[in-house]
Amino acid sequence: MKTLLLTLVVVTIVCLDFGHTMICYNQQSSQPPTTTTCSEGQCYKQRWRDHRGWRTERGCGCPKAIPEVKLNCCKTDRCNG
């Protein structure tokens, strides 16, 4: 019985992951919203204008800022919508 209880506790801890992952949007520009699970603990959204108009890129992590690109990095689930 103790072994079963210990196994359940371990499985629960592994499944919960204690918040080390988060959910980020990862669709590009006008694509339908999609999400992914990120282990980096951050999401980003960057926007820039080109000959087609405003372009948007979303994903995990926080890339290095580039001139003329609006970059927003954040640390909560789905914060890069």
Curated annotation (Swiss-Prot):
Keywords tagged on the record:
Acetylcholine receptor inhibiting toxin, Disulfide bond, Ion channel impairing toxin, Neurotoxin, Postsynaptic neurotoxin, Secreted, Signal, Toxin
Q: Which Gene3D superfamilies match?
A: CD59
User: Pfam families under this entry?
Assistant: Toxin_cobra-type (PF21947)
Return the SUPFAM superfamilies for the record: Snake toxin-like
Q: Which PROSITE patterns match?
A: SNAKE_TOXIN
Q: What is its main location?
A: secreted
**Marked site (May be critical for toxicity) residue numbers:** 52, 55
At the top level, the lineage of the source is: Eukaryota
Q: Hey, what tissues is this thing expressed in?
A: Expressed by the venom gland.
- CC annotations in GO: extracellular region
Disulfide partners: 24-43, 38-60, 62-73, 74-79
* Signal peptide positions on this chain: 1-21
Q: Name one GO molecular function term.
A: toxin activity
**Cell location:** Secreted
Family statement = Belongs to the three-finger toxin family. Short-chain subfamily. Type I alpha-neurotoxin sub-subfamily.
Q: What does this protein do?
A: Binds to muscle nicotinic acetylcholine receptor (nAChR) and inhibit acetylcholine from binding to the receptor, thereby impairing neuromuscular transmission.
Q: What is this protein called?
A: Three-finger toxin MALT0057C
